[in-house]
């Protein structure tokens, strides 16, 4: 499935006249920064500065597939969290819910496949939770299994990241745990999204609300025309206090 989707996203001999990036800019309080122009941005690839032709507000209408797995909260907290998240999206946005039937890596690929089939212009995968595993039990009986505990994503992380990038899908996540989730954080960073690891469930609702606001206040940067698209460039702004995240953007997926 992974290889087939990658092949579909990168047809042989395809040429792209211009390159577009989807960029998030946040202040030191985590709030989106509005009103930026091309002069505010610097884009470099392999140390060479690229020309920014235009900066426009991205469409605030998004299509989110929310995946639930191992989230350490009550049903009431989850319902409230979803309400805050959806309430910060525009009225035309779509949020579909997806559970994990097998492995989490498979669920993410299935979400990518679903978004690709719908040809949405602003596709998002949001993971609420994380992978899980059976903790070893100190009891020797074969009838006793350890409890489930939070765990990082396993599988071919680089290939999943490449698939998300090929389809210009942002990956976000929120997990309530003290377990390191380096692979999930890496996956989000590669796409221009972000994976939040929070220590307490009482911060879940506010974190989800911030993600919703972020999705509705992003930029599309158009770069100078090129006969081919190279490695993902580095995007920065003049103010060092601002946080910048960037990923690929395409009008079709």
Show which residues each predicted segment covers.
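Bacterial N-terminal signal peptides
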Residues: 1-8
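Scaffold/interface architecture of coatomer-like assemblies
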Residues: 12-253
């Amino acid at each position: 499935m992974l290889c087939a989707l990658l092949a579909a996203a990168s047809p042989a001999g395809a040429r792209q006249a211009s390159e577009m990036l989807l960029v998030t800019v946040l202040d030191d309080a985590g709030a989106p920064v509005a009103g930026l122009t091309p002069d505010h941005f610097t884009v470099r690839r392999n140390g060479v500065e690229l020309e920014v032709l235009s900066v426009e507000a991205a469409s605030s209408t998004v299509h989110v597939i929310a995946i639930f797995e191992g989230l350490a909260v009550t049903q009431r907290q989850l319902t409230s969290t979803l309400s805050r998240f959806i309430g910060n999206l525009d009225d035309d946005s779509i949020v579909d819910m997806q559970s994990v039937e097998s492995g989490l890596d498979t669920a993410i690929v299935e979400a990518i496949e679903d978004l690709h089939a719908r040809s949405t212009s602003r596709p998002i995968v949001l993971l609420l939770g994380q992978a899980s595993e059976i903790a070893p039990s100190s009891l020797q009986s074969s009838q006793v299994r350890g409890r489930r505990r939070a765990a990082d994503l396993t599988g071919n992380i680089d290939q999943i990241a490449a698939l998300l990038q090929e389809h210009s899908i942002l990956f976000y996540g929120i997990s309530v745990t003290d377990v390191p989730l380096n692979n999930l954080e890496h996956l989000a960073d590669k796409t221009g999204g972000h994976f939040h690891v929070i220590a307490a469930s009482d911060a879940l609702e506010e974190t989800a609300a911030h993600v919703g606001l972020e999705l509705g206040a992003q930029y599309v940067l158009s770069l100078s025309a090129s006969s081919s698209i190279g490695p993902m460039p580095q995007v920065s702004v003049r103010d060092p206090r601002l946080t910048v995240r960037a990923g690929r953007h395409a009008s079709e997926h």
